[in-house]
Amino acid sequence: MAKEKPHVNIVFIGHVDHGKSTTIGRLLFDTANIPENIIKKFEEMGEKGKSFKFAWVMDRLKEERERGITIDVAHTKFETPHRYITIIDAPGHRDFVKNMITGASQADAAVLVVAATDGVMPQTKEHAFLARTLGIGHIIVAINKMDMVDYDEKKFKQVSEQVKKLLMMLGYKDFPIIPISAWEGDNVVKKSDKMPWYNGPTLIEALDQIPEPPKPTDKPLRIPIQDVYSIKGVGTVPVGRVETGVLRVGDVVIFEPASTIFHKPIQGEVKSIEMHHEPMQEALPGDNIGFNVRGVGKNDIKRGDVAGHTNNPPTVVRPKDTFKAQIIVLNHPTAITIGYTPVLHAHTLQVAVRFEQLLAKLDPRTGNVVEENPQFIKTGDSAIVVLRPTKPMVIEPVKEIPQMGRFAIRDMGQTVAAGMVISIQKAE
């Protein structure tokens, strides 16, 4: 059997109106991956004889968005010669940040769309910081709307310089910068003849070269539980995605914070593992599995628990413990002060956490401290804070298990901040 092409998850980021949706639309249109329902609508409208026009498709997608149905960009797939690519989300979605952190899919790469007409705008910066905070290691830059600047090389160079400065400051290296016109279809899938001065890859060629994400099999086993089922003749079956490590039939696993909450080890031997209804002997990172554990009942575990090996159990932070985190405030109506208690979302858990200390305000670009012990932090600020959970929860320092160390903070139906765990302080 030939080795399957690697699967790569990408997100589209960038300032509002710089053409993220159009770029996604063009990728799908030119690779013949337009959503079924749109094609159906086209046929129903008796437009059979006419050629399927890009503008028409974009209007339909726009209508759907305005009716609150974002093209399920939420999971749009297409293929390149060497990759299966899934577009997992595009901002503008209210839950974009939360999805990026708690979504079943962590993004492997981001496409940053910047309009040649505007250059770097506030949201361009914010999304780039966010990509960094969320640990997205690979970025591709698409300078869009080249048709509106007459495909001018000078304009392209000028905007490229701004973007380069921003991304290098954030620690990104080796990122392609591609001049495109999503609307006209230049350099997205088809090479443009309007920019003879450019000889780099098209957007789809750059996507085809995204490095394959390494599977973190060498890290401790962590499986955040999404659901728990009772299956007749099998017993209790927790379901979740292996984030790190390897699970094998016969392993002994323990669940946290369940064990901490019940004051006794909720653990047992793994009797069977299944993926897509097929039994398997071992599960690797990225696998969505159901598994059965001897002696663990339906009421012992729930969504938000995490399975790990007994010799390296998941890290529990209790209400008497605290953890230090670096956050970026994305959207808070006033200011965050000590005592603020919103809800933290990480992997599959949701727990209210209290802001215990505001240690430092950082320059989001350099990470340097600009103010010690600030009185408050507000939208746009990056900060080091100390948080205390209101009930036991599992989270890991991002340096040790990055997949388990990122979180979103939500309140009033929106994502207030995104962050990562620096260290955990256990009370004796």
UniProtKB/Swiss-Prot annotation:
Transmembrane segments: none annotated. Residues 144-147 are annotated as: G4. It catalyses: GTP + H2O = GDP + phosphate + H(+). Residues 68-72 are annotated as: G2. It is an enzyme of class 3 (hydrolase). CDD domains: EF1_alpha (cd01883), EF1_alpha_II (cd03693), EF1_alpha_III (cd03705). GTP binds at residues 14-21, 89-93, 144-147. Residues 5-215 form the tr-type G domain. Mg(2+) binds at S21. It is found in: Cytoplasm. Signal peptide: none annotated. Its EC number is 3.6.5.3. One of its GO terms (molecular function) is GTPase activity. It comes from the Archaea. Its main location: cytoplasm. Residues 89-92 are annotated as: G3. GO terms for cellular component: cytoplasm. Keywords: Cytoplasm, Elongation factor, GTP-binding, Hydrolase, Magnesium, Metal-binding, Nucleotide-binding, Protein biosynthesis. Residues 14-21 are annotated as: G1. Residues 181-183 are annotated as: G5. HAMAP family: EF_Tu_A. Belongs to the TRAFAC class translation factor GTPase superfamily. Classic translation factor GTPase family. EF-Tu/EF-1A subfamily. GTP hydrolase that promotes the GTP-dependent binding of aminoacyl-tRNA to the A-site of ribosomes during protein biosynthesis. This is Elongation factor 1-alpha. The gene is tuf.
